[in-house]
């Protein structure tokens, strides 16, 4: 796994139009190598945009959080492999993960199991009908992801250290809910700064609003990259 901050920062293109996404990618230029595309942009023509990004040499994390019957998940993953994506999320349910791993075998696609959304706190987990607190549920799903042969998991930085003890050093730990010091949390409830997340064991950081909504996105991304590099090179 690369130790370069540039390979570990994933800018979330949580934007309503392709034109806005293209503007951000153009603004960030060679400073940023990795982008995340989720539902909002995907359903505005973003899947073709994702192909174009990959073809231009950028890495693309397709945040689709797949969950369905085994065959449906497998067929979806097969097509996503053909798109040239670098990362793909699915909910960390054992059968779905196993189907995805089998479908992606032999490719470079890194499959990520989503444990508990970083917008959820303990009460949200209870309200959803789970008998566990978020931390316990994250660790259980991390173990299931490891057993299924997944490439990594998605979890908050708060759980990253404990997750590392379970999955080891080779799997990716991708962390959303990253907020630079002084930034607003927005709809995230379990957040950390870039430096805190790297120290906790996160391998990749997903940052959206603090960059794409910044007055100067390039300066914002460079500040985050510098903070990450300071920890990675220490």
UniProtKB/Swiss-Prot annotation:
Catalytic activity entry: orotidine 5'-phosphate + H(+) = UMP + CO2
Pathway(s) per entry: Pyrimidine metabolism; UMP biosynthesis via de novo pathway; UMP from orotate: step 2/2
Transmembrane helix found in the keyword field: no
One GO biological process term: 'de novo' UMP biosynthetic process
Gene Ontology molecular function: orotidine-5'-phosphate decarboxylase activity
SUPFAM superfamilies: Ribulose-phoshate binding barrel (SSF51366)
Cystine pairs: none
EC number: 4.1.1.23
PROSITE patterns (UniProt xref): OMPDECASE
Binding site for substrate: 14, 36, 63-72, 118, 179, 188, 209
EC class: lyase
InterPro entries: Aldolase_TIM, OMPdecase, OMPdecase_AS, OMPdecase_bac, OMPdeCOase_dom, RibuloseP-bd_barrel
Any GO CC annotation of this UniProt entry: cytosol
Location of the active site: 65
Record carries keyword Nucleotide-binding: no
Highest taxon in the source lineage: Bacteria
A matching Pfam family: OMPdecase
Keywords: Decarboxylase, Lyase, Pyrimidine biosynthesis
Family, as annotated: Belongs to the OMP decarboxylase family. Type 1 subfamily.
Function of the protein: Catalyzes the decarboxylation of orotidine 5'-monophosphate (OMP) to uridine 5'-monophosphate (UMP).
SUBUNIT field: Homodimer.
Protein name: Orotidine 5'-phosphate decarboxylase
């Amino acid at each position: 796994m690369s130790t370069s901050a540039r390979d570990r920062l994933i800018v979330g293109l949580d934007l309503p139009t392709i034109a806005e996404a293209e503007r951000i990618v153009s603004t960030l230029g060679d400073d940023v190598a990795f982008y995340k595309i989720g539902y909002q942009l995907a359903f505005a023509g973003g899947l073709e945009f994702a192909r174009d990004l990959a073809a231009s040499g950028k890495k693309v994390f397709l945040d689709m959080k797949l969950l369905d019957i085994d065959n449906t998940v497998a067929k979806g993953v097969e097509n996503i492999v053909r798109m040239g994506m670098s990362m793909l999320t699915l909910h960390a349910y054992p059968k779905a993960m196993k189907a995805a791993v089998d479908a992606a075998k032999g490719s470079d696609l890194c499959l990520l199991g989503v444990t508990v959304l970083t917008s959820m706190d303990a009460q949200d987990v209870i309200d959803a009908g789970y008998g566990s607190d978020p931390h316990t549920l994250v660790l259980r799903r991390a173990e299931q992801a490891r057993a299924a042969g997944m490439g990594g998991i998605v979890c908050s930085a708060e759980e990253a250290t404990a997750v590392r003890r379970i999955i080891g050093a080779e799997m990716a730990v991708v962390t959303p809910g990253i907020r630079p010091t002084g930034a607003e949390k927005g709809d995230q409830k379990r957040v950390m700064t870039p430096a805190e997340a790297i120290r906790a064991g996160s391998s990749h950081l997903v940052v959206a609003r603090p960059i794409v909504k910044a007055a100067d996105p390039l300066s914002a991304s460079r500040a985050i990259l510098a903070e990450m590099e300071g920890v990675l090179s220490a």
